[in-house]
Amino acid sequence: HQQFHCPSAEGNQVKKVFSCKNCDKTYVSLGALKMHIRTHTLPCKCPICGKAFSRPWLLQGHIRTHTGEKPFSCQHCQSAFV
């Protein structure tokens, strides 16, 4: 963090900042910016109701609300849950 704000005397390098075009957030890596952009584009859409999500695993969990699937169970009482 300090290297970003106070470049060393030997390098005096200014790190590139990646800015989101949809909001005022900035990132020090392109990968982090790409992950953030998904919060604006919501590329994962539910085929049943159309609700959109930024991450595939969020969609996967949502689909269980339609199917009623409860993939996890208590090892003591066998009660199932999402």
UniProtKB/Swiss-Prot annotation:
Location(s) in or outside the cell: Nucleus
KW Acyltransferase (keyword) present: no
Zinc finger (C2H2-type): 1-5, 18-40, 44-66, 72-82
SUPFAM superfamilies for the chain: beta-beta-alpha zinc fingers
InterPro entries: Snail/Krueppel_Znf (IPR050527), Znf_C2H2_sf (IPR036236), Znf_C2H2_type (IPR013087)
Keyword Thylakoid assigned: no
One function term, GO molecular function aspect: zinc ion binding
Keyword entries, A-Z: DNA-binding, Metal-binding, Nucleus, Repeat, Zinc, Zinc-finger
Domain of life where this protein originates: Eukaryota
Disulfide bonds: none
Pfam families from the UniProt entry: zf-C2H2 (PF00096)
A GO cellular component annotation in the UniProt record: nucleus
Protein family membership: Belongs to the snail C2H2-type zinc-finger protein family.
Protein name: Escargot/snail protein homolog
